[in-house]
Amino acid sequence: WDGRRHQMRRLGDSGIFELFIPGIKEGSIYKYEIKNRKGEPMLKADPYGNYCELRPNNASVVWDLGQYAWTDQDWMKERAKQDTKDKPLNIYEVHLGSWIRKTLSINEDGTEVIGSEFYNYRQIAVKLAEYVKQMGYTHIELLPVMEHPLDASWGYQVTGYYAPTSRYGTPDDFMYFMDYMHSQGI
């Protein structure tokens, strides 16, 4: 990709631009090249991208969201029949990165030394579903899972509104997370 050769074209007066580059494969990274008021080129991530590079990098990643094979059709049909006013509702609000991280080691006194490495969405799904059911919760509310630059934050400095954060895996891993929660009745 070369911003001088591959220029986007505007679709009428819609404010929408498009570009086709043959041979792009899933996993390819890309950015938009935009000229500022001084005419200097700047590289920016796709504000509508659905997958981003792992921090500290910030390019958008080509990803096919249609390849995941959902298994929650029965849960979705059952949910449509439910009246939420007829059953108790107990919501567990959780930030995935704060809730659990991988253990680096265990001290002599048995305390864990928690590391900075995250579990992935698939691993978190199993652990969180077990915890939520054990504690009697019926629903979960995730604190921001959109892409954001800083691990120390809860994700409110969003850089990719349509991209689940890559620090826990791919968009397919996130879809698995949701699918698994539904399979557990959550």
Locate the predicted segments by residue.
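Loop/turn elements at helix/coil->beta-strand transitions in domains of secreted/extracellular proteins
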Residues: 89, 133-140, 182-186
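Aromatic-lined carbohydrate-binding/catalytic grooves of carbohydrate-active enzymes
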Residues: 102-119, 130-176
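Short loop/turn segments at connectors of secondary-structure elements within structured domains
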Residues: 2, 26-28, 136
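Short clusters of hydrophobic/aromatic residues that line enzyme substrate/ligand-binding pockets
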Residues: 8, 62, 75, 161, ...
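Surface-exposed loop/edge segments in extracytoplasmic proteins
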Residues: 1-7, 40-42
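Short amphipathic alpha-helices and their capping/turn segments at secondary-structure boundaries
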Residues: 78-82, 125-136
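Hydrophobic positions in alpha-helices of CheY-like receiver
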Residues: 177-181
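The feature marks proteins involved in alpha-glucan
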Residues: 11-93, 98-118, 123
